[in-house]
Regions:
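Generic detector of bulky aromatic hydrophobic side chains
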Residues: 31, 35-38, 46-51, 116-122, ...
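Short low-complexity stretches enriched in small and charged residues
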Residues: 134-147, 180, 188-199, 227-231
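Nuclease-adjacent, charged terminal/linker segments that flank catalytic cores
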Residues: 1-149, 154-163, 170
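Generic hydrophobic secondary-structure signal
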Residues: 2-4, 20, 28, 37-43, ...
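Catalytic core segments in nucleotide and nucleic-acid processing enzymes
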Residues: 190-309
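Acidic-basic catalytic patches of nuclease active cores, encompassing PD-(D/E)XK
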Residues: 155-209
């Protein structure tokens, strides 16, 4: 039974309701999150700026002593640097940048990569933010406060966007889980989907598929084996997706289509369902429907009943 992909008459209304549902959540959640993050990062930003007194440049040792400051240093350049852009300019592995920022980089990695990173930071330093550098005098308190305020805002935008994405995914998964538990389904923690029993679901489990002759894994956010299904059969695969604007959704719509094609090629009949919240337009829905992909809207969770649960 189709859930929504054949119900074209309601698509436009659903899009409006989905956008409104997302916007209500965003207005409630985002401002307080931004303020919380701002309070947490201000001290670290001030510490980084203290390394820019007078003619003293940021030296390589600052990352060895404080590797997690890299997240802040990336916001001190013109333009601010994304992780992958910094990795390319510094000729280092992208995972090394992440290692600095989350504090997991090894001592050898700090020593090897810090000079390359700091060379890029110094070359691209935003001198409009730090006009006192090479001026022959130290910064005034007003100059330091202005620089800190701008960097904090840049950093908070980056951190808030990531936090919002994570929170939206958590919220979507919670909505699905609450529905399933209300239907009497039980969470399992199998190693493979074949270990799921009828009436169980699993969170974040891979499904192996073939890509040509190569076997790859498709990550499933929620895998559900209906009570009427046979043990060991392919479960319903649910992927939670949210978007805060219409700009990027159509750039990624082929990803879902590719997953569906791989599932069909490997298993024949497969049920791949998207759990959509936020901004998904008619072009996106039409493309996915043409690929045989169905969806449940976050603002109408009870539609999951139509999955035969």
């Amino acid at each position: 039974m189709s859930v929504n992909n054949e119900n074209r008459a309601n698509w436009a209304i659903d899009i409006e309701e989905s956008v409104a549902h997302y916007n209500r959540w965003f207005v409630d959640y985002a401002p307080s999150t931004f303020r919380d993050i701002k309070g947490k990062v201000f001290g670290n930003v001030a510490k980084a700026i203290e390394g820019l007194n007078g003619k003293i440049d940021l030296d390589d040792d600052i990352l060895i002593a404080h590797p997690t400051l890299l997240l802040i240093l990336r916001q001190m350049t013109c333009p601010p640097l994304a992780r992958d852009r910094l990795a390319g300019l510094a000729r280092i592995p992208p995972q090394a940048v992440r290692g600095f920022e989350n504090g997991t980089i090894s001592r050898n990695g700090q020593v090897e990569y810090s000079p390359r990173i700091m060379e890029v930071i110094r070359d691209l330093l935003d001198f409009d933010l730090f006009p006192w550098i090479d001026s022959g005098s130290g910064p005034s308190s007003e100059q330091k406060e202005r620089a800190a305020a701008i960097i904090v805002d840049r950093l908070c935008i980056t951190l808030t966007d990531a936090d919002i994405r994570n929170e939206q995914e958590r919220r979507q998964l919670l909505a699905i889980i609450q529905f399933l538990k209300g239907k009497g389904y039980v969470e399992a923690k199998p190693r493979t989907y074949g270990e799921l029993r009828p009436g169980e679901y699993a969170i974040h489990l891979n499904i192996p598929v073939y890509q040509g002759e190569k076997k790859v894994n498709i990550p499933g956010d929620v895998l559900i084996l209906p009570r009427t299904a046979s043990p060991g059969s392919l479960p319903i695969i649910v992927e939670a997706k949210s978007a805060g604007d219409f700009t990027n959704v159509n750039k990624r719509r082929k990803e879902e289509a590719t997953k569906m094609q791989q599932l069909k090629a490997t298993y024949g009949n497969a049920r791949f369902i998207m759990f959509l919240g936020g901004y998904f337009d008619l072009g996106y829905l039409d493309y996915e429907a043409a690929e045989g992909i169905d969806w449940v809207w976050e603002h109408r969770v009870p539609d999951m009943e139509k999955l035969g649960l």
